């Protein structure tokens, strides 16, 4: 029996144990996960919590040899404990079943392949105003219906994962000639103004989590390179690295809190082949604090300055990719062929730029979220927003109310390394070099 088969046997003999407690904390549901440790275990657990739209208020991560233990304090989107027993049972079953999944490593290239239900298309290229409008127009002309999609933009780059079906059959597109035509026309759209950076259009058969796949696409497209530093310090994340004894690198991150932040960071570390051995997460309205003790999968800390700079850049990019810049617009309407094309064309004709979008359809209903700015990246004037709502339908397109802006993130007092929970617990064990 080789080492890989032996590791699988150990995991089967020691299934994960999940304990959910609503009495241990006054303001959160506590989820404890104990399992055999392997690369990607932490990401699997965080991915389940993220997919359930749970908010991670605090987390404590620790691994001892081949064993892994996590404690998460979570709440729902309304800030309450998770009381529904069916939801709690589902969380437990998902975590226990996911613990056996194999998480594939980061792919070196972006590749279009159909599943039975839909055809998955991945795009990467230079961002520009009207890009999503042009892409959706091409798909409509080719008799493709967008059933769900997610589009991210960051640092002049754009990435998308789009699931489409045939208009007539409502199933995946399998004709290789038609797939080739779709790929060619989409590539022409994405390639425009791409300059020296290659544009990519592929059909993907990957079963990788969609949001993780978007991180991989943008990482492969090197969106972390040459990030402009002119933005105010309060709007940028702070990432620092420090090597300590016991051959750990401590990664400390401070940023404005937002949904799915922990997933984005853990996903990036995992795909960069770093293992989290210990860590803590604490999120507050003003600031989110994350601290991880990591090594490369080869067991070594981050030694070179070049590697340290690359990790910092990549984590900053991971935090920024879906920071909610722009005005959030929510569309609720009857789904129909060409709906996305019509909506995005209206945005383009009114000089709006889509910086991020989530497209979904369910039971004949379209529920889409768009984050928009004007073409210069500035806030959209209210009169333009109202004009667009009149064109699309006031009851269909709504402006999501923004929470009150908090005080400057970097202007608030922060815990030092010694006074954070993890820093306090480990300060007597690990001393800075």
Curated annotation (Swiss-Prot):
Identify the CDD domains for this entry.
ACT_ACR_2, ACT_ACR_3, ACT_ACR_4
Query: Which Gene3D superfamilies would you find in this protein's record?
Result: 3.30.70.260
Q: Which controlled-vocabulary keywords does the entry list?
A: Repeat
Task: List the cysteine pairs that form cystine.
Answer: none
Cross-referenced InterPro entries, in alphabetical order?
ACR1-12, ACT-like_dom_sf, ACT_dom
Tell me where on the tree of life, at the top rank, the source sits: Eukaryota
**One Pfam family, short name please?**
ACT
Keyword Cell inner membrane appears in the UniProt entry: no
User: What does this protein's UniProt record list under function?
Assistant: May bind amino acids.
Its name, as the record gives it, is ACT domain-containing protein ACR6
Q: Which organism is it from?
A: Arabidopsis thaliana
